[in-house]
């Protein structure tokens, strides 16, 4: 019973938002008010506890997700809050994706001036994907142009959310001093002498009473839509609804993802953080609120297995991040869903089918470790001593294996060639890159077979800058960089049917395979890579050779016919063929499939595909013509223009990534430093033939195949 009670008072939450909405500052205030730090660290001073990497402190941005455990007293009850501070920059979305996979709830922070920005949209969609209940926190209410109600409107219109304000601000910009709590109908006013540690509960200022009553009525109306009992009371007599009933309805609506309670504050000015912590305890779910976790049987992926959130169930945990720590070596962060994990115990890795020993366990405070004897059910911790655990691995009990749904990570869109400056750097480079690739699934390392160059790929220029920086600082590797390269892909346009025969006679047993197949673009609704259809009748190709044909095409897709770029999707239908009772084997059919792929793609009108980015530029009105002119030169397509509340113009466009290198510097020049831009990956699109020919000439590819 005690364990269940402990679970009830545990919260696994993340703070997510657009870059610069104040996530890390909010986290720092939470650490201060929960007593974990005795001094507030400021992001702009490079002293934030959660931003522990040197690059984060220098750049004032969050790159990795720092995990911290804090405690908060609410309603005479001690709550344990596992807090994950995630990055807002688009190049680090993998960190957000990893965190949301293992969180029970999230605080979505918004800037009171900027409102719903591109990356806030991205993280909101990621939270929807993992069914993570959210409360909204409108930060920076002290800034010039702050408008809480406008942000609430944007949540409804841009994100399609159902925001439910449970506070309204008292004042705004420099006059912001507190909030009206619409549940208790009291004013909460912070005093600056105590660094915001205390606030006074007062009567609502006379000039705000009417507005507060109007917003309270809107809150009750929203709640009545989600709760039948409350609806009856609301229509009979709203004044009979008690505070406890409102809190219960808010919690119920949040957990069902029907509403998003909205709060406001100014973390930097120390106002509104305690009420945010109270709201986390009141409205966000505990591990006990998600009673079961679903996985599949490793030996039969169609068989669903459930685990109850209970310490008495067999162990089931998910590794969501691997990090290299200078003192303890490789750390694995994991969330325990059922059972418990004691230090020194063996766990079974469902992916590698091997046992791993976790020698020591820690609860993390940013990058400092507090040793633990056991990580219990519903908790988040970190372990060391393992050999082969990767992001997304399921750790379980060997006698009760289970595989939890892993995470999907986007493919990198940009690459650069790196080479060590000295022979001494060469050995270190390999080790450093391997460790960094292990930590970050969106970072890839490849060796170009023709040139022998090492090419590293990632989600954007900033992502690769940080990687190069970490190689220098953590692994003491100095390296030269080539210019950025776009991660092109290939595709085919036309269906091609052909017969491919592979024969080899070298004395003794030979090789033989014969395939008749149709190769074409995948169906529009197909989501995987290779859409493979077996239509062979009458055993003309024995069943045991069909997987080898499939494997051959899968291997072949990694290197297209134009310049060796991968194909994202392909449909292959094996229609017929023949085999030799002695000479045919699995390898023969695999090689035959590789050749069939090459010959078919050459005839199928292959095309080059390039990544297209979604760009949003906020610029003063007078620079707008220059910004649009520059985008047109970069093959951009302007999709819309809006006015922001601050009088600036917002230009939305789709632009090929190949044209966007160094864009930030160019934008600064044409707008005298007054414009800002955000860029996220949108989709892949066909490269115009004249440009495709230039790209293929540089890559020493098959220009002759471009029509």
Swiss-Prot record:
Functional summary from the UniProt entry: Catalyzes the GTP-dependent ribosomal translocation step during translation elongation. During this step, the ribosome changes from the pre-translocational (PRE) to the post-translocational (POST) state as the newly formed A-site-bound peptidyl-tRNA and P-site-bound deacylated tRNA move to the P and E sites, respectively. Catalyzes the coordinated movement of the two tRNA molecules, the mRNA and conformational changes in the ribosome.
Single GO biological process annotation from the record: ribosome disassembly
Protein residues bound to GTP: 17-24, 85-89, 139-142
Family that this chain belongs to: Belongs to the TRAFAC class translation factor GTPase superfamily. Classic translation factor GTPase family. EF-G/EF-2 subfamily.
Protein name: Elongation factor G
GO CC annotations on file: cytoplasm
PANTHER family linked to this entry: RIBOSOME-RELEASING FACTOR 2, MITOCHONDRIAL, TRANSLATION ELONGATION FACTOR G-RELATED
Subcellular location(s) per record: Cytoplasm
Protein species of origin: Porphyromonas gingivalis (strain ATCC BAA-308 / W83)
Protein's gene: fusA
Family annotation (InterPro entries): EFG_II, EFG_III, EFG_III/V, EFG_IV, EFG_V, EFG_V-like, EFTu-like_2, G_TR_CS
Boundaries of every tr-type G domain copy: 8-288
Keyword annotations: Cytoplasm, Elongation factor, GTP-binding, Nucleotide-binding, Protein biosynthesis
SUPFAM superfamilies in the cross-refs: EF-G C-terminal domain-like, P-loop containing nucleoside triphosphate hydrolases, Ribosomal protein S5 domain 2-like, Translation proteins
GO molecular function terms attached to this record: GTP binding; GTPase activity; translation elongation factor activity
Matches recorded under HAMAP family: EF_G_EF_2_B
CDD domains, alphabetized: EF-G, EFG_III, EFG_mtEFG1_IV, EFG_mtEFG_C, EFG_mtEFG_II
């Amino acid at each position: 019973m005690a364990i269940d009670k402990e679970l009830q008072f545990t919260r696994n939450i993340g703070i997510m938002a657009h870059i610069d909405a104040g996530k890390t500052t909010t986290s720092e205030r939470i650490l201060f008010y929960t007593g974990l730090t005795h001094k507030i660290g400021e992001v702009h001073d490079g002293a934030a506890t959660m931003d522990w990497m040197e690059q984060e402190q220098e750049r004032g941005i969050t790159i990795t997700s720092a995990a911290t455990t804090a405690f908060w007293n609410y309603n005479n009850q001690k709550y344990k809050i596992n807090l994950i501070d995630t990055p807002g920059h688009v190049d680090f979305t993998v960190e957000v994706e990893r965190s949301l996979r293992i969180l029970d709830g999230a605080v979505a922070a918004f800037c009171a001036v900027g409102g719903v920005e591109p990356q806030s949209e991205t993280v909101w969609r990621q939270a929807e994907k993992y069914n993570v209940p959210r409360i909204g926190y409108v930060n920076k209410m002290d800034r010039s142009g702050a408008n809480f109600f406008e942000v609430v409107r944007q949540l409804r219109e841009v994100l399609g959310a159902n925001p439910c304000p449970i506070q309204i601000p008292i004042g705004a910009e420099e006059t912001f001093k507190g909030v009206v709590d619409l549940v208790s109908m009291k004013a909460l006013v912070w005093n600056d002498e105590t660094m915001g540690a205390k606030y006074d509960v007062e009567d609502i200022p006379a000039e705000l009473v009417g507005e507060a009553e109007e917003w309270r009525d809107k809150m009750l109306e929203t709640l009545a839509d989600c709760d039948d009992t409350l609806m009856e009371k609301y229509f009979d007599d709203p004044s009979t609804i008690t505070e406890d009933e409102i809190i219960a309805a808010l919690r119920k609506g949040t957990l069902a993802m029907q509403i998003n309670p909205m709060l406001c504050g100014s973390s930097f000015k120390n106002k509104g953080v305690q009420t945010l912590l109270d709201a986390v305890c009141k409205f966000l779910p505990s591990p006990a609120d998600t009673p079961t976790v679903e996985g599949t049987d490793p030996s039969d992926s169609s068989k669903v297995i459930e685990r109850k959130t209970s310490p008495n169930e067999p162990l089931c945990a998910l590794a969501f991040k691997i990090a290299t720590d200078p003192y303890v070596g490789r750390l694995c962060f994991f969330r325990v869903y059922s059972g418990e994990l004691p230090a020194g115990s063996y766990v079974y890795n469902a992916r590698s089918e091997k046992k791993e020993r976790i020698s020591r366990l820690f609860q993390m405070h940013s990058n400092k470790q507090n040793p633990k004897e056991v990580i219990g059910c519903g908790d988040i911790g970190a372990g060391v001593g393992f050999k082969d655990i990767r992001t997304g691995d399921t750790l379980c009990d060997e006698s009760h294996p289970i595989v939890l749904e892993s995470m999907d990570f986007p493919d990198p869109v940009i690459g650069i060639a790196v080479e060590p400056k000295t022979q001494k750097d060469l050995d270190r480079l390999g080790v450093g890159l391997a460790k960094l690739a292990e930590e970050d699934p969106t970072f890839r390392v490849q060796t170009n077979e023709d040139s022998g160059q090492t090419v590293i790929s990632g989600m954007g220029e900033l992502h690769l800058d940080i990687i190069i920086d970490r190689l220098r600082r953590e692994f003491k590797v100095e390296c030269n960089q080539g210019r950025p390269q776009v991660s092109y892909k290939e595709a085919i346009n036309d269906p091609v049917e052909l017969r491919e025969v592979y024969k080899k006679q070298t004395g003794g047993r030979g090789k033989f395979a014969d395939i008749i197949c149709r190769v074409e673009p995948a169906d529009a609704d197909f989501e995987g890579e290779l859409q493979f259809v077996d239509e062979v009748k009458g055993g003309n190709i024995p069943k045991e050779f069909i997987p080898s044909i499939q494997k051959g095409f899968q291997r072949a897709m990694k290197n297209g016919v134009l310049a060796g770029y991968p194909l994202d999707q392909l449909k292959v239908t094996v229609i017929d063929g023949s085999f030799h009772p002695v000479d045919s084997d699995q390898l023969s059919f695999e090689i035959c499939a590789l050749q069939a792929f090459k010959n078919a793609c050459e005839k199928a009108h292959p095309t080059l595909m390039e990544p297209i980015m979604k760009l949003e530029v906020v610029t003063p009105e007078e620079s707008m013509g220059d910004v649009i002119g520059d985008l047109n030169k970069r093959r951009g397509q302007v999709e819309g223009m809006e006015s922001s509340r601050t009088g600036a113009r917002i230009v939305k466009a789709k632009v090929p990534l190949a044209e966007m290198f160094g864009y930030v510097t160019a934008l600064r020049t044409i707008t005298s430093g007054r414009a800002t831009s955000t860029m996220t990956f949108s989709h892949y699109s066909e490269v115009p033939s004249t440009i495709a020919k230039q790209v293929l000439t540089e890559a020493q590819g098959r220009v002759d195949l471009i029509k």
